[in-house]
Structure formats: C-alpha cells, structure tokens
Amino acid sequence: MKKSVKRKFGHERGIKYRKKTGDITRKKRLYFMMFAVFITMFGLCGRIFWIQFIKGEWLKKMAYEQHSMDRFFNPCRGTIYDSTGEKILAVSGSVESITVNPVNIKKDDREKLAHKLSDLFQLDYDNVLKKISKRSSIETIVNKIDKDKSNELRNWLVENNITTGVNIDVDTKRFYPYNTMASQIIGFCGVDNQGLMGIESKYDDELRGKKGSITKLTDAKGGSLENEGEEYLEAQNGDDLILTIDATIQGIAEKYLKEACIDNKCTDGGNIIIMNPQNGDILAMAGYPDYNLNNPYIPITEEANEWDSLSKEEKTKIQQNMWRNKAISDSYEPGSTFKLITASAALEEGITDTDNTSEFNCGGGITIGGVRIKCWRYYRPHGSESLREALMNSCNPVFISLGQKLGVKTYYSYLEKFGLLSKTGIDLQGEGGSIFLNENKVGPVELATISFGQRFEITPIQMVTAVSTIANGGNYIKPRVVKKIVNNNTGEVKEIQSEIKGRAISEETSKKILSMMESVVSEGTGKNAKVQGYSIGGKTGTSEDGVNTGKYVTSFIGVAPTDNPQIVILITLYNPTGEGGHQGGGVAAPIASQVLGEVLPYLQVKKNNDEGNEIKKVKVPNVIGLKFSDAKKMLSDSNLNIDVPENTDENAIITEQIPISGVEVFEESNIIVK
C-alpha cells in the first residue's frame, strides 16, 4: 500500500513537473516570437523612417532624374570695367550651343544630320555620328557658336522635318574689347566659362553667376514625353567688377614698355607698375611680352611663326611665360633702388641726416669682415659726401656703413615694416614672395650686400608698395586691383576699402627721403627721368640676374610730384642687351620720363612754377676713338658732362661710352666713358 501510494504520488509529481516545464517552454517561445515581431517591426519602422525622412529627398531626386532630363545653360558672366566705370575690359556676349538627345532622333535622320553638323561646324563626321547614335539622353555637339550658324541649322532642321532631338540653347562667350590690354592682370576663361588666369580666376566666384536649366520629362529610355512642357530655371548673372586700373594709363605704360623692350633688346621682357601711394590703387600694371586675351593660347611674338613646329613641352613653356604676371610672381635683385629703404631706416633711427657735409667718405670701397666691397665708381671715388650726395651718386660704401650701424635686428625690423618679408596680399592670382636669409644667418658681409640691394630678391609689387609707403608719409597700404563689386541682380555695390597695415616711418623721414629722391633726378643718376614742369623724385638701379650669369636687371623707381605724391612708378627691364647698355639711369629712367610726361597731364596734376626753365634734350655724340681731352670738349659743347676713371691720361683713346651715340638725353647728363 505504501509503495502504491508512493508511486502514485511520484507519478503525479512527474506529471506536474512536465506540465510546468511545458508551460515554461511555451512561454519562452511566445516571448521569443513577440521579441522577434518587435524587432522586425522596429526594423521596418526604422527603415521607413530612414527612407521617408533621411533619404526621402535624395530618393525623390533620383526617381525624378530617372524620368527627367536637364539641359544646363551658362549665365552671363560679370563685366569687368576700368576705374572710370566706362571702358569695358571684359564682357560676355550671347552665343549658342548645340546638344542632341540621341534617343529622340530617328534612325533615318542620323546620317544626314551628322553630315550637316560636321560640315557646318567643321567637326569630325564619324565622331558626330557616334554621338548621335548613342543610347544616351543628351550629348554635346559644339559650344559657343555664332548665331548665323545656329540660324542656318534651324532652317535646315525645318526643311528636313527634324522636329525633335536637336537642341539649340543660349550660351555666352567671353570677349575682350582691347585684345592685349592688361592681359596678365585680367586673365581669361576656359570653354566652360571658368576663370583660368588673373582677375578672371581670382574673382571667379563673383563673376561666374549661377547656371540656368531646362528640364523635360522623359520615358524609361530617356525619350521626351509628348504633351509635356518644360521647366525653365533662369540663370543668375555674375557680378560686375570695377578695377583700379585706368585704361588710358595702362595703354600709355604698355606703349612705352613695348618700345623699350624692343629698342633695348630685353631678352626676358619687362614690366611697369604705376600705383597711387595714397590708397594703394594699381593704376597700371604692364608686362611684356603679353598676349591676346581673345586667343590666349597662341603667342603674338615671333614665336607664333614657328608655333606649329614646336613640341607640346615647348608650347607649354611659352604659354606659361606669356601668361605669367612677372610684376607680382617673379622676384629679382632690386639693386640701388633699395638704398631708399636703407636710408629711410637710418634717418628714422636718427643715426644720420640728409645734409651733414662730409659725414661720409668714399674711398672706392669698404672692407667688412675681411671682404673688400667696391663702389660702382671705384676707379674715381666719390670722396666726401652727405647722405643726399651719396644717394645722388648711388655710392655703395655709404649705405653699407649705414647698414652696419643699424645692425641686423633693427634692419630686419624695417624690412618687416615695409612689407618686404611677406607677400603684399594683392588681389591677383599667383603672387610670389621675397627671398631673404634668415635673420640669425645674416653676418656683417651679408648685411653689407643687403644694404645696397644685392644678394636677396623681392617682387616688383613689393618694391613699388614699399616706396609708396615712403611717398604717402609712412603708412604701409595693401595694394589692390579691384575697388568695387556690383551685384547685377540686386544693384548692390560693395566697396573694397583701402587697407592700412601699419606705419613704417614718420612723416618727417618721408619728406626727407622725397627731397633726396628729387635731388637724384635733378642732379644725380636719375636725370633722364625729368619731366618739364613737374618735380620728379626717383632712384636708379642695376643688378645682376643671378650669380655670374652675365644678365642684368635694370630699373627705375619714381615718385611724382614730390611735393604731393600721386604716382609711384617702377620700371623693370630684364636683361637689356642693346647698345644703350644696362644702367638704370640710361635705360630705365628715360622711360619714366616718357610715361610720366603723359600720365601727369592726364591726371590733371598741376605743373609747378619753374615751367619757364625748359629742360632740353640733346643727342649723345659719338666720342669713341677720340682722346679724352677731345671727348670732354665735344660733350661740353652739347651741354653734357663726362664721367671718366680717376687718373685717366688726357691722351688716352676712348673705347667705350654709355649711353651710345644717337641716344637722346637731358642736358647736363653724365656720359660714362672708358
């Protein structure tokens, strides 16, 4: 009995256990299924949310693009004006472009259409036929065609009953009314209307505008749907630019620069920068050789005659050279023009003054750190000099001694104040920088050469900006080329303000330097820069282009008028090889006289009161082959001075003269003979 009860109890307990276990299993399955359903629903909801709210716009766009076709057309690129706002330097004209929708062109029309397009636009027939026969929605045939040709195509399409598949859309093409004028400043555009060089590139975002479009609904194959209209989105034209460049002054600078480069056989060209020192405006920036903006890939120099025979590499080299704006991108040794910076620093620091008689003595050279550095006129030393006389004579030893007194740290602080250790920040593409030794590597000899403008390099724009700092009373002003941006859609005008970066020297020092610069032109090495009726200040410069290259850079920096500076002009000629030599006073200074002689009256700058004392020019006689005594008399009869080596024998025969005979110079100019 006990056993039976036990078995019964055990049996019931087992049944209850199995029942309990089964219940748990069913619950687990139920929970698992509920969890799985929850996860699935959560995932589906998440996916729906992702599709609807996160990727919804993108998917809608993709779906729309699958059954629509866009044809884009360019906006009218902004116009570029000169400083007057009247002369147009760059403008976009209306042309047209041809595209096709291959899926909408009937097979029977393809060959004759390809023949017409290839003949009319001088294209390769096979290439055109290949485009027309593609299974694509749109192909470009040709861009920027004249309207007479597009009208001819329109008439042909009507005559041949081709009503779909060929699109003639409005486009724009860039035109440059003055062809070569300011080519290296303005730059040019590519076939897609994107600026590639100069201002066109620097201000591309402002000039380009926003493209417009024509949208059509299409079927699955890309064909146009009948009875469906087009959606037209108007293009937004680009902004206009008003430059600081004055087209008249630019033309004057380019005219005389070209003449000078050709007459003096400047193998590496030249440039002229004219700047308003009071506000940093670049009034002109001429470079030679230049190029035609309407055909920028072909040179206009003698190289054009052999263009087709040149290799791709040779063509690229020539193009890069003519496109490059050397006035801002290339560095050079400024030579004696840099003595203005040394003199400014020395005067500002109070270690010298302009007219201390016999303060300096030129013995033909000076020894620094065991190295003998000669004066350019070592053969007949200048002797006792004041600072004014030293600048007039361009005497190297005087400026070397000033540099030594200033010391490296102080000298470099003035280089920084004059903006010579960094780029100017001019709003043009491709500005280069200066090349100076690190301050901690400059010893006495290095400082000596820097003091008279050698063994370092700066860009022409840095030099003209530094001298503009002297001319305006001591403020360093950032140069600029664009002064206004005009929004074509709203009419809003944005003024680009002049930016004063800091003070380099005092007004007192500025006046002293300007006074000495005037003496350089009236009595010193810059006599050939004189302009009747105006007070002109300046400094000549000659330096070697590289070390032992045999090439020279000739320059002149000028200020006019010195009593109220409105112009700073820098003329730089690279490797003049003509008979006139390579001295700044004989080659570059006369160009300044020509340019300023036209620019100052154009700007209505008043003449001074000594207009009655007419400055006459005379032709230099030929004294080669004469005795020194005879040459001296001949030059004196022409109101010219002779510059001869010290202790020259009166009976010695002259074998060289600078400038050569026939060159016109002002009376009282020095003629160097050897």
Protein language model features and the residues they cover:
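Periplasmic/cell-envelope proteins involved in peptidoglycan metabolism and beta-lactam response
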Residues: 1-305, 331, 409-419, 529-530, ...
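Beta-lactam-recognizing serine transpeptidase/beta-lactamase-like catalytic domain environment
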Residues: 7-8, 89-90, 219-230, 278-337, ...
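Short aromatic-glycine motifs in intrinsically disordered, low-complexity regions
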Residues: 68-69, 172-173, 526-527, 541, ...
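Extracytoplasmic
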Residues: 73-78, 92-95, 136, 163, ...
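Structural motif
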Residues: 82-83, 368, 531, 623
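Residues at or immediately flanking beta-strands
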Residues: 165-167, 240, 269-271, 357-359, ...
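Glycine-centered C-terminal helix-capping/turn motifs at helix ends
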Residues: 208, 352-353, 625
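Ligand-recognition elements built from short beta-strands and adjacent flexible loops
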Residues: 533, 571-674
